[in-house]
UniProtKB/Swiss-Prot annotation:
Gene Ontology biological process terms from the UniProt entry: fatty acid beta-oxidation
Gene Ontology terms, MF aspect: delta(3,5)-delta(2,4)-dienoyl-CoA isomerase activity
Protein name: Delta(3,5)-Delta(2,4)-dienoyl-CoA isomerase, mitochondrial
Motif (Microbody targeting signal): 326-328
Main location group: mitochondrion
Species the sequence originates in: Pongo abelii (Sumatran orangutan)
Family: Belongs to the enoyl-CoA hydratase/isomerase family.
Domain of life: Eukaryota
GO cellular component, one term: peroxisome
CDD domains listed in its UniProt record: crotonase-like
Catalytic activity annotation: (3E,5Z)-octadienoyl-CoA = (2E,4E)-octadienoyl-CoA; (3E,5Z,8Z,11Z,14Z)-eicosapentaenoyl-CoA = (2E,4E,8Z,11Z,14Z)-eicosapentaenoyl-CoA
Organism ancestry: Eukaryota, Metazoa, Chordata, Craniata, Vertebrata
Length: 328
């Protein structure tokens, strides 16, 4: 507590000195930060395999400092989600969540499309041919499979680091489950999104029906997409709020996604990860509950040294990239 009081006093003294300095007339302060060359950095950094991430269905690279790039890596199968994928995604994002050096993540698909969704041929033995003949036991078995598959995308949402989905080509079925668990979605002009499950005789059960209404805020449109399995093209996805930006092609989109990840990773990890936690809490709770939650959260987070470092950089017109924040 004493350390927090000392930090608060130092921050107050710093602000007082800056506010009364001659180059800040009228006791006003601007927190405008100069732009960062994230775009150049994103496109100019050679990719390297990330240590401790070796998978069959995924490729994980260190795109740049503090940024990991996770690729769905079954291009010959249109990145279809086989049994190995469902296990490896959980393993991958559990590691990322614990990786103190990682501050932002980009997810994309290798090859010609983001993903064709569930690999039904690979998973047929588990889903369509359960063992036994007792209805209750078969039901419990299938429920266990469903909840494990749900966790594959829950770990993305629960990951404290912001996750950016970069979609090109088709994003079908399970792909929509995946991207709606991400924090930010970019897409290329050739992208389309399809809630495909109704065409194969089932209801989507690993996240789309729960997250998509919250993402786009239009229940009528969600119902239309889920009942018909029609394609939502890139421009409609932008207009509905499913994605925040559309780019001419995959290459430009990936550069932009990595640039955004670099910009996010230049900020205080305490601030960014606290923001993600509170945004997710606020999505599922009332305004009053969420205000109480963030007050309890920030009663400790306001004591971070990152606050003083960020304010000092702003008052000196320095880029946050020049500030060294400790790992989190």
């Amino acid at each position: 507590m004493a350390a927090g009081i000392v930090a608060s006093r130092r921050l107050r003294d710093l602000l007082t000195r800056r506010l009364t300095a001659s180059n800040y007339p009228g006791l006003s302060i601007s927190l405008r930060l100069t732009g960062s060359p994230a775009q150049e950095e994103a496109s100019g950094v050679a990719l390297g395999e990330a240590p401790d991430h070796s998978y069959e269905s995924l490729r994980v690279t260190s795109a740049q400092k503090h940024v990991l790039h996770v690729q769905l890596n079954r291009p010959n199968k249109r990145n279809a989600m086989n049994k190995v994928f469902w296990r490896e995604m959980v393993e991958c994002f559990n590691k990322i969540s614990r990786d103190a050096d990682c501050r932002a993540v980009v997810i994309s698909g290798a090859g010609k499309m983001f993903t064709a969704g569930v690999d039904l041929m690979d998973m047929a033995s588990d889903i369509l041919q359960p063992k036994g003949d007792d209805v209750a036991r078969i039901s419990w078995y299938l429920r266990d499979i469903i909840t494990r598959y749900q966790e594959t995308f829950n770990v993305i949402e629960k990951c404290p680091k912001p996750v950016i989905a970069a979609v090109h080509g088709g994003c079908i079925g399970g792909g929509v489950d995946l991207v709606t668990a991400c924090d930010i979605r970019y897409c290329a002009q050739d992208a389309f999104f399809q809630v495909k499950e109704v065409d194969v005789g089932l209801a989507a059960d690993v996240g789309t029906l729960q997250r998509l209404p919250k993402v786009i805020g239009n229940q009528s449109l969600v119902n239309e997409l889920a009942f018909t399995a029609r394609k939502m093209m890139a421009d409609e996805a932008l207009g509905s709020g499913l994605v925040s930006r559309v780019f001419p092609d995959k290459e430009v989109m990936l550069d932009a996604a990595l640039a955004l990840a670099a910009e996010i990773s230049s900020k205080s990890p305490v601030a960014v990860q606290s923001t993600k936690v509170n945004l997710l809490y606020s999505r599922d709770h009332s305004v009053a509950e969420s205000l109480n939650y963030v007050a309890s959260w920030n009663m400790s987070m306001l004591q971070t040294q990152d606050l003083m470092k960020s304010v000092q950089a702003a008052t000196e017109n320095k880029e946050l990239k020049s500030v060294t924040f400790s790992k989190l």
